[in-house]
C-alpha cells in the first residue's frame, strides 16, 4: 500500500485523483481517508497498487498512525506556497 501523507489542504487528494483518473481537481474538499486501487505494470508484470489518501487534519492522526505502521511506501506531499507544510513533513514518519 502506498500511503499519501501531508498537512491538510496541500493537495494529497488532487494528486491521488490525477494519478488514478487523469483528472485534476482544483477544489478543496477535506478527506477523511480513502483507498483507491491503481493497476500498474512493474518489470513487465501487472500489479494492483492500493493508494491510501489520508486526512491531513490533526483530529484524524490516530487513523493515520495506524496506516503509517502498515504502509509499504509513502508519498509526502507539501504545498510550495506553505513553508510550514514542508517543515511539518517530519511529523509523518
UniProtKB/Swiss-Prot annotation:
Recorded hits in Pfam families, A to Z, give: Ras
Task: Enumerate the SUPFAM superfamilies for this protein.
Answer: P-loop containing nucleoside triphosphate hydrolases (SSF52540)
An example Gene Ontology biological process = signal transduction
* InterPro entries according to UniProt: P-loop_NTPase, Small_GTP-bd, Small_GTPase, Small_GTPase_Ras-type
Question: Which PROSITE patterns does this chain map to?
Answer: RAS (PS51421)
Is GTP-binding there in the keyword field? Answer: yes
Lipid bilayer topology: Lipid-anchor
> Where does it localize?
Cell membrane
> Where's it mainly located?
membrane
GO MF annotation list: G protein activity; GTP binding
Its Gene Ontology cellular component terms are: plasma membrane
Q: Any stretches that span the bilayer, and where are they?
A: none
The record's catalysed reaction(s) read: GTP + H2O = GDP + phosphate + H(+)
Q: Where is this motif: Effector region?
A: 28-36
Stated family: Belongs to the small GTPase superfamily. Ras family.
Q: Which PANTHER family match?
A: RAS, DI-RAS, AND RHEB FAMILY MEMBERS OF SMALL GTPASE SUPERFAMILY
In UniProt terms, what function does this protein have?
A: Ras proteins bind GDP/GTP and possess intrinsic GTPase activity.
Q: Would you tell me the protein name for this molecule?
A: Ras-like protein
> Which species expresses this protein natively?
Limanda limanda (Common dab)
